[in-house]
């Protein structure tokens, strides 16, 4: 399924140090929510995991995923801006330490070594293809706005 381009303010937020809330679906249909560092690679959102976690098992079974990414901005109506991304994910083995190191520069600062262990395992990279955007902010103008 073709995705939606990540543009403007949505891209800026996803490339910032805002931590995403990641929602996958458990086998019984209930939501599984975790927090994750995210980045952008072309028109995909990427995140990395070293151990094989529940979110990865959920995504292998059902690739639907949602992210909620808060900002610190309040709009003219007093609402906190946040981005919601609905999409599909694919999990690949390997590359997690390299992606985590790249993201660590954004989230922790330059010169940080992450993961903080010698010879980390290859882990997993999740690549998310956005299908649509929502939330409150310039990526989703309010109804009735010009």
Give the residues covered by each predicted segment.
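Short, solvent-exposed coil/turn segments
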Residues: 7, 15, 31-33, 78, ...
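Short beta-strand segments
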Residues: 18-51, 59, 67-70, 81
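Alpha-helix boundary recognition
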Residues: 14-15, 60-61, 119
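Charged, gly/pro-rich active-site loop segments
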Residues: 1-5, 76-146
